Amino acid sequence: MKSLALTLGDPAGIGSEVILKALADPSVGENYNITVVGSRSLLEESYHQLRSLPHVNHSDLVDPANLLILDIPLDKTTKSQIQLGKGNAASGEASFTYLQAAIAGTLKGEFAGIVTAPIAKSCWKAAGYHYPGQTEVLAQAAGVEKFGMLFVARSPYTGWMLRTLLATTHIPLSQVPTVLTPELMTLKLELLIDCLKNDFRLDHPKIAIAGLNPHSGEQGQLGTEERDWLTPWLEEEKKRHCEVELVGLVPPDTMWVTPGQAWYGNAPHPQHGADGYLALYHDQGLIPVKLMAFDQAINTTIGLPFIRTSPDHGTAFDIAGKGIARPASMIEAIKLAQALVNG
């Protein structure tokens, strides 16, 4: 069985810590074939530094000597500039190099998929890499133009699965109404439908689609996008996708009531929640996701020719090296990647 590539992410952040903790978890370490992609020496240094902290249980960390590692050594100058908690051009260079190595191996068929630890976009920029994030690098390397950021989380209370796709991602809020078009919405909706059918094996999925403005525009009183084109667009999509239950446009302030009930077990039954949610911009989708599932949520890139997942948190420079980073999201990212690979 091919292994999953697991990148170290930004070495100044918590990537090494959550990886060492996630791979020490019995539910992962004993059941998954993982190749860590990054600097062996940096991972070993992180391991020994964390073990030196009095509050860290040694059994919560896997010894790097027991891991399969695709070693990406850093030159002395770059390595000397990397310091926990202080991301910079050197740490950005390292994380970009790790990602490129994982992509190259995956495209060659050496890995079954990729799980990425967090990077810092500011550090990439400092190193001369001007990408909005890892998603765009992956899409460019794979030669795909149609892709999306899907956030997935399984409720620890009910087992219900939340799946949220963003129509727009890392752009200023002021640009959202201009960037949103019928063509973009169709692209994202079709990506979500294909993912729900093919990856999650849902033959007749239910998808809820949010409005853009308060109260979905209140018939043009609070914004005209819904009246002018979003509602007509959705009506056409309902005709095109008879096998899918499309619900909307749901007012953004009530969009997340039903999934919240399904998540916490307050709905008559968990199936009250939709199978997928299409949010129109970053914070509209991710504020509720992180409120419900900060430790469980996973980012998976759909539309790629291979599986990619990542924990839904950042580099957390402020707590790097303190031994308090939680590995739950990384554990879930590994499990979902393997489940998707297995089909």
From Swiss-Prot:
<feature type="binding site">
    <location>
        <position position="170"/>
    </location>
    <ligand>
        <name>a divalent metal cation</name>
    </ligand>
</feature>
<feature type="binding site">
    <location>
        <position position="215"/>
    </location>
    <ligand>
        <name>a divalent metal cation</name>
    </ligand>
</feature>
<dbReference type="GO" id="GO:0008615">
    <property type="term" value="P:pyridoxine biosynthetic process"/>
</dbReference>
<keyword id="KW-0479">Metal-binding</keyword>
<protein>
    <recommendedName>
        <fullName>4-hydroxythreonine-4-phosphate dehydrogenase</fullName>
        <ecNumber>1.1.1.262</ecNumber>
    </recommendedName>
</protein>
<dbReference type="GO" id="GO:0050570">
    <property type="term" value="F:4-hydroxythreonine-4-phosphate dehydrogenase activity"/>
</dbReference>
<keyword id="KW-0521">NADP</keyword>
<keyword id="KW-0520">NAD</keyword>
<dbReference type="InterPro" id="IPR005255">
    <property type="entry name" value="PdxA_fam"/>
</dbReference>
<comment type="pathway">
    <text>Cofactor biosynthesis; pyridoxine 5'-phosphate biosynthesis; pyridoxine 5'-phosphate from D-erythrose 4-phosphate: step 4/5.</text>
</comment>
<feature type="binding site">
    <location>
        <position position="299"/>
    </location>
    <ligand>
        <name>substrate</name>
    </ligand>
</feature>
<feature type="binding site">
    <location>
        <position position="308"/>
    </location>
    <ligand>
        <name>substrate</name>
    </ligand>
</feature>
<comment type="similarity">
    <text>Belongs to the PdxA family.</text>
</comment>
<dbReference type="GO" id="GO:0046872">
    <property type="term" value="F:metal ion binding"/>
</dbReference>
<feature type="binding site">
    <location>
        <position position="282"/>
    </location>
    <ligand>
        <name>a divalent metal cation</name>
    </ligand>
</feature>
<feature type="binding site">
    <location>
        <position position="290"/>
    </location>
    <ligand>
        <name>substrate</name>
    </ligand>
</feature>
<feature type="binding site">
    <location>
        <position position="135"/>
    </location>
    <ligand>
        <name>substrate</name>
    </ligand>
</feature>
<comment type="subunit">
    <text>Homodimer.</text>
</comment>
<comment type="function">
    <text>Catalyzes the NAD(P)-dependent oxidation of 4-(phosphooxy)-L-threonine (HTP) into 2-amino-3-oxo-4-(phosphooxy)butyric acid which spontaneously decarboxylates to form 3-amino-2-oxopropyl phosphate (AHAP).</text>
</comment>
<dbReference type="InterPro" id="IPR037510">
    <property type="entry name" value="PdxA"/>
</dbReference>
<dbReference type="GO" id="GO:0042823">
    <property type="term" value="P:pyridoxal phosphate biosynthetic process"/>
</dbReference>
<keyword id="KW-0963">Cytoplasm</keyword>
<keyword id="KW-0664">Pyridoxine biosynthesis</keyword>
<dbReference type="GO" id="GO:0005737">
    <property type="term" value="C:cytoplasm"/>
</dbReference>
<keyword id="KW-0560">Oxidoreductase</keyword>
<dbReference type="GO" id="GO:0051287">
    <property type="term" value="F:NAD binding"/>
</dbReference>
<dbReference type="Pfam" id="PF04166">
    <property type="entry name" value="PdxA"/>
</dbReference>
